[in-house]
A protein has these predicted regions:
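Short glycine-aspartate micro-motif
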Residues: 2-6, 61, 125-129, 218
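Phosphate-binding/catalytic loop of phosphoryl-transfer enzymes
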Residues: 83-86, 92, 96-164, 194-204, ...
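Phosphate/pyrophosphate-binding loops at sites that engage ATP/ADP/AMP, CoA/4′-phosphopantetheine
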Residues: 43-59, 203-215
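Short glycine-rich, Thr/Ser-proximal phosphate-binding strand/loop in the N-terminal lobe
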Residues: 2-45, 143-170, 174-175
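Short beta-strand-loop/turn "lid" adjacent to the catalytic site in phosphate-handling enzymes
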Residues: 50-105, 142-148, 153-154, 182-193, ...
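Residue-level signal for inorganic ion chemistry
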Residues: 14, 62, 131, 161, ...
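A short acidic, often aromatic-flanked loop/helix-cap motif at beta-alpha or helix-coil junctions
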Residues: 33-34, 92-95, 241-245
Length: 256
């Protein structure tokens, strides 16, 4: 069994793979105050709940965009799972060509997404990851990762409105009754959801001009389904794309 761990700014996502099959998955809140012992005990508990023990683990593959938590999770894996995790970083085998000007600055999650898409769907493709930040990633037919675009995620934008506009409330992201909000909550929901959908449609159109008409559009992340319900430009939704990418990266760097 392979344990994959994706450390994001909002969530820590884990997947347990039996071969290519995602056997179990979990999504935890990212907690900057949590110590290695707490992470380790939690990981042990998750394995137990999945009816597995440490003896069943054959490897751990980890990607992180939160440097201050990486060391804690690595320590937790060493001390509580008795295993040194494989950390996605510059210099590992990816099977794709990273054309970013500074490859070291590309988030490990973006590389994992690109690898998963290239191996599972092929290019050209635009991969949209709806997380704390929403990223658009461009992959050519030849398997080149070109880069992409980064913008604030929907929830981050909603929180910014609440934090910086005195009279605007904190809201749940739901579909309003109409594009024209008749109260403040519905107006905010309209602006956030439909405005975001329009942004996605516009970005996809611009990416397609660069990558060609055969470009696939694949979405992942917690809000992918919410956005996809409002537009036809998203062709494939893969909730656990990043974890799939980590599994593939593990296999590429640990051949049988």
């Amino acid at each position: 069994m392979l344990l994959t761990i994706d450390i994001g700014n909002t969530n820590l996502t884990l997947g347990l793979y039996d071969g290519n099959n995602l056997f179990a998955h979990w999504r935890l809140a990212t907690d900057h105050a949590r110590m290695p012992d707490e992470y380790g005990l939690q990981f042990q508990g998750l394995l137990k709940n999945a009816n597995h023990t440490l003896k069943d683990l054959t490897g751990i593959c980890l990607a992180s965009v939160v440097p201050q938590l990486t060391a804690r999770v690595v320590q937790a894996c060493r001390e509580y799972l008795d295993m040194e995790p494989f950390v996605v970083d510059v210099g590992i085998k990816t099977g794709i060509k990273v054309k970013y000007e500074d490859p070291k600055s590309v988030g490990a999650d973006r590389i994992a997404d690109a690898v998963a898409v290239m191996y599972q769907y092929g290019g050209p493709a635009c991969v949209i990851d709806f997380g704390t930040a929403t990223t658009f990633n461009a992959i050519t037919k030849e398997g080149e990762y070109l880069g992409g675009a980064i913008t604030a995620g929907i929830n981050l934008a909603a929180e910014a409105l609440f934090t910086h506009a005195a009279k605007l409330p904190r809201i749940d992201l739901q579909r309003p009754p109409s594009i024209i909000g008749r109260n403040t909550v519905h107006a905010m929901q309209s602006g956030l959801l439909f405005g975001y959908v329009s942004m996605v449609e516009g970005m996809v159109e611009r990416f397609r001009k660069e990558l060609g008409p055969s470009m696939k559009v694949i979405a992942t992340g917690g809000l992918a389904e919410v956005v996809a319900q409002e537009t036809d430009v998203i062709q494939i939704i893969t909730p656990w794309l990043t974890l799939d990418g980590l599994r593939i990266l593990w296999d590429l760097n640990h051949p049988l």
